[in-house]
Amino acid sequence: MISLMLSSSSPFRSSPFSHASSAALDRLPRATKLTTELASVSPWFEERKGRIAKVFDKKEVGISTYDTAWVAMVPSPLMISSGEPLPCFPDSLLWLLENQCHDGSWAQPHHHSLLNKDVLSSTLACILALNKWGLGDQHIAKGLHFLEMNFDSAMDPSQITPIGFDIVFPTMLDHARSLSLIPTLDQTMLKELMNMRDLELKRCSSSPDMEAYLAYVGEGQDRERVMKYQRKNGSLFNSPSTTAAAYIASPNSECLKYLNLVVNKFGGAVPAVYPLDIYSQLHTVDDLERLGISRYFVTEIESVLDQTYRCWVQGDEEIFLDASTCALAFRLLRINGYNVSSDPVTHCVVGHMNKDVNTALEVYKASQLTLYPHETQLEKLNSSLGALLQDQISSASIQSTQLHAEVQQALDYPFYAILQRMANRKAIEHYNFDPTRILKTSYCLPNSGNKDFLLLSVEDFNRLQAMHQEEYKEFERWFVENRLDELEVARQKVEYGYFTAAATISGPELSDARMSWAKNCVMISVMDDFFDIRGSVQEMEKIVELVELWDVDISRECCSNDVSIIFSALKQTISEVGDKGSKLQGRNITPHIIALWLDLLYSYMKEVEWSGSCSNPSFDEYMSNASVSFGLGPIVVSTLYVVGPHLSLDMINHSQYHNLFTLTSTCCRLLHEIRSDERELKQGKPNALPLYIAENGSMSKEAAISEMITMSNTLRKQILTIVLDNNSVFPKPCKQIFWNMLVANQLFYRKDDGFWSKELLKVAHQIVHQPILL
């Protein structure tokens, strides 16, 4: 019998108040309600919220020198009398002439020092554009000098390589050489670049998965390959440069229509991607949710998601023809309860994603949201992309520190195995101020790297933490007042109990829910240790008897000191949450909580009986009892009654409630059994893993673990399906409590018994005690 959250061997340091004297106890401050007066609010808090709300109306897109250069190369369909073409977009040419840097390059302002390959590519494209129309001889000369002085960057492995650079840049160099523009470049390096280009083309041409990639980076080299990817708006991949190159190679009225649209919208300089509205808006929503401040922008977020869902239903190409947008839309829509199919995500081409880590990461996170048995392709995508991203980590090929951390987190902590506040803190700590993204060229993602996002999230995190710290003091006072510090096995339970509460139920208005969760966690751990290790059979039976009688004067009962302490603390805890829950629900809910505790105690006694008789139950018989002895009922249901929504008797008796209860209990128990079999066998206790092996003949332990993990994964998907169903009778905040419990156990048992993890000890301290400092 092991408790849901707490282990008898937990390595947490003892509570600082475990042995507090009565005098010290009296000096402890009483916690105050901070729902209306959290820690002091900075005068800029509301101002930042207002500025963030306005970003949903912003649709600014950063300009791209590279794309502008290709647009500037486009000839006009009109011919002068001599038959020579004119530039179709003279404003783009003018922009090139007016925006060369002093060093001769056409770098973006304040470009990153690792983006020299991008600068080389953009500068060469500008040179070719000006040369095509016989303009800017001095600009061209300065640009060529820059290329000569910085050409070695093209082969520098420490530099960030834009998508397709190994094809695009050598191809432009070839064209420049044919025009006798670059006679002084290092010929050995030039030859090496050409060889790399040829090898890359050969490698990609042999893979059907790379066809779209070649069309994107081919810059009009293969009309048949490129034009099959033309979209309804006339573009190729929503890329002005790819579309311009395709038009130059073979004029097409739809391509020209798209280019006219982009130039008319943005003026001479064009962006690297257009349109980008859906992805930009979704990225903003994702940032706010990851940083833990989405509750301040519910209306704006709902508007974005509703509009995205309409576009999804209508089959909008901006979603379905871009892997990043499709994956992000799918993930945010599904996790927010919209009914969306995973089929579009599974059509994302994996072949070229090793060249675009951002896209690979986006699709990988989406692929974690498998719900249904038929979504096998989504699971395969998850497996293949997980391996790809792990290779990127192992080979140290991700040069961005923030992106490396984000990929590592996604691999280590899938969304179903990381607590809310834990994820929020990691997102804050890894927040990337640099809005630069890399495709064929660099561009700035609108609203990415927004300083207000970070400042608001840090202040909000610390304000909530200040409230949690006050609650924690009250929690420790409860621990000491109920003499739980006198039970040696219970001394290390306080922090884990409150950590899981604060990390999953963090809202300022949910103090009662946090305290109910945390106190019941500790009580179950105390009871679990007592039935496992400390208590005699007579003492166990006495505890059961006292809970059955309930209204007893413990001072008149003949029982041990341990039994007296445990029953008194349990009665006080149940009575407290019962009173609060009864007031909120408008009916007496205490008998239900007592009944849940009795079910738990009866299941404990069944395990004591099995251990004492040395008899082994069947796997199914064991799991039926073990799902109860795991202790989910008292923690979760007590919390349900004080988390907010009204829970009628019809809801509590509804099959959906019982189904969710059983699924979650069983899934959590399976996770525990897989990671604790050796310890429990040493204690002479039955465990599901050896029982499962015994019932399946010669099955190896590894095979049994694999099958039990598959069982737990299936249960997790069923649970999430219920939680995300917006049409269910059970209130969403209540379903979320079940999900929080599952996530906590997924975290603790994702690799081994997490109660031994120094990493989780550190996380618990960070969430409850350590403010974020900028």
From Swiss-Prot:
Pfam families: Terpene_synth, Terpene_synth_C. It is found in: Plastid, Chloroplast. Mg(2+) 1 binds at D528, D532. Mg(2+) 3 binds at H672, S676, E680. Keywords: Chloroplast, Hydrolase, Lyase, Magnesium, Manganese, Metal-binding, Plastid, Transit peptide. Binds 3 Mg(2+) or Mn(2+) ions per subunit. GO terms for molecular function: hydrolase activity; magnesium ion binding; terpene synthase activity. InterPro entries: Isoprenoid_synthase_dom_sf, Terpene_synth_N, Terpene_synth_N_sf, Terpene_synthase-like, Terpene_synthase_metal-bd, Terpenoid_cyclase/PrenylTrfase. Substrate binds at D528, D532, R669, H672. The keyword Lyase applies. Pathway: Secondary metabolite biosynthesis; terpenoid biosynthesis. Gene3D superfamilies: 1.50.10.160, Farnesyl Diphosphate Synthase, Terpene synthase, N-terminal domain. Residues 1-30 form a transit peptide. Its cofactor is Mg(2+); Mn(2+). The Asp-Asp-Xaa-Xaa-Asp/Glu (DDXXD/E) motif is important for the catalytic activity, presumably through binding to Mg(2+). Belongs to the terpene synthase family. This is Diterpene synthase 3, chloroplastic. It comes from Salvia sclarea (Clary sage). The gene is TPS3.
